[in-house]
Amino acid sequence: MCDFTEDQTAEFKEAFQLFDRTGDGKILYSQCGDVMRALGQNPTNAEVLKVLGNPKSDEMNVKVLDFEHFLPMLQTVAKNKDQGTYEDYVEGLRVFDKEGNGTVMGAEIRHVLVTLGEKMTEEEVEMLVAGHEDSNGCINYEELLRMVLNG
């Protein structure tokens, strides 16, 4: 199981309490996915239903759970988080390959990394792409991905 630190658990509990509308330390089943997403996870609705034990749709706004029952569900979702494959990342970057030659503009990849998804700082991006740009300012994204994914 993916164990959380004491600080993480405290942060998760604080976020959980923000969704507790009645102040009884519980949230509705229907809020479970929202809380997980607020905590940086991205479970599908099917994954949320699975960790909740596949409740009927009419139970979603009736059944409640407390933090002690929510935390193991969050751990399950975090542990099963799809990290994506090399091919997934290549496909994602191929969208930016306007010439179809396996390269993307360095400026464009920088922009994507600092503005979309799990945003990186400009310093992190510079460290990542350092030495990968050719004389035209292009980056071979397959080569970059191999370097990133292989450490």
Swiss-Prot record:
One of its GO terms (cellular component) is brush border. Keywords: Acetylation, Motor protein, Muscle protein, Myosin, Phosphoprotein, Repeat. One of its GO terms (biological process) is skeletal muscle tissue development. The modification N-acetylcysteine is found at residue 2. Residues 7-42, 84-119, 119-151 form the EF-hand domain. SUPFAM superfamilies: EF-hand. The modification N6-acetyllysine is found at residue 81. One of its GO terms (molecular function) is cytoskeletal motor activity. Myosin is a hexamer of 2 heavy chains and 4 light chains. Interacts with SPATA6. Regulatory light chain of myosin. Does not bind calcium. This is Myosin light polypeptide 6.
